[in-house]
Amino acid sequence: MTALTQMKCEACQADAPKVTDAELAELIRMIPDWGVQVRDGIMQLERVYKFKNFKLAMAFTNKLAELAEEEFHHPGILTEWGKVTVTWWSHSIKGLHKNDFIMAAKTDQLLD
C-alpha cells in the first residue's frame, strides 16, 4: 500500500463505506502510535502528543489546523499545557474512513 502520507483525502459523503475490520487491522499498523477509541458508538483514532510547554503545544495545534484546512478534513483537538490530544473520525459516516488514517499519518509527520 502507498504510504499514507503520500495520499490525499477524498470527498467523504454520508453513504461512503466505513473501513472494514480487515482494512482497520492493516491501516492501524501503519500508524502504530495511534489508538482506536469508541465514543457514543463511533469509532475514532486518537493520539496524545507531548510537548515541553504550552507554546510548543499551541504551535503544533496551529500547524495541524493548517493541514486540516488544506485537506478539508478536520479533527477534534484538545490543546493543554504540554500536550495535544488529536482525534480523527469522519463525521458524515459516523466512523472511520481511510481519510482518517491518512490524516493521522500526516499529523505524525508534523513533528518532523
Curated annotation (Swiss-Prot):
Keywords: Lyase. One of its GO terms (molecular function) is 4-alpha-hydroxytetrahydrobiopterin dehydratase activity. One of its GO terms (biological process) is tetrahydrobiopterin biosynthetic process. Signal peptide: none annotated. The keyword Oxidoreductase does not apply. It catalyses: (4aS,6R)-4a-hydroxy-L-erythro-5,6,7,8-tetrahydrobiopterin = (6R)-L-erythro-6,7-dihydrobiopterin + H2O. It comes from the Bacteria. Its EC number is 4.2.1.96. Coiled coil: none annotated. The keyword Lyase applies. PANTHER family: PTERIN-4-ALPHA-CARBINOLAMINE DEHYDRATASE-RELATED (PTHR42805:SF1). NCBIfam families: PRK00823.1-1. Belongs to the pterin-4-alpha-carbinolamine dehydratase family. This is Putative pterin-4-alpha-carbinolamine dehydratase. It comes from Shewanella sp. (strain MR-7).
